[in-house]
């Protein structure tokens, strides 16, 4: 269906998965920075013939990041769960995409939506609240602007609200349906109080 985003958002526990990034330039820096900002303990291997100093500095701050300054080899994919390609080599991207498809490994290819299994959306984090924004690969700039807007709009005490809701949830007795009913009433009254 045209005009509808059919992507399904998923929040991955990257500290439990092995991620490979291929590319050590500006785009590689953007990808690894985004992953580490959201998941500081992410297990990442970055392979590139040349790795920017900014990436090396970032890796130095994160012990779960391994850098390999050499040419990428197809066997680098071995035992990886998620692949991110951040090079400008379309032929390499197509070769790797074909291989990952045969192995059921998820892949993202920077600025190449037709080769992607998933997109890296724009992420808003306020304490334990995390919101992902996707434009279905059409405009990362719009996703970025939405992120900026939501970061400003969400209250700084969002985490306090979440902690309070967890306490209420933990105290509610009854079956699942009863808990949902009570939590809906609590959040509904909170939203009415904000109007």
Describe the residue ranges of each PLM region.
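A short, basic/flexible loop-to-alpha-helix module at the beginning of a structural domain
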Residues: 1-14, 120-121
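Glycine-rich adenosine-cofactor-binding loop
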Residues: 10-33, 164-176
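Residue-level detector of alpha-helix initiation sites
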Residues: 26-27, 91, 137
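NAD(P)-binding Rossmann-fold cofactor-contacting core
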Residues: 30, 38-58
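Glycine-rich, highly charged phosphate/nucleotide-binding loops
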Residues: 60-76
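ADP-ribose/adenylate-binding Rossmann-like module
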Residues: 82-88, 93-119
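E1/E1-like adenylate-forming module used to activate ubiquitin-like modifiers
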Residues: 106-159
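An accessory alpha-helical subdomain
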Residues: 137-195
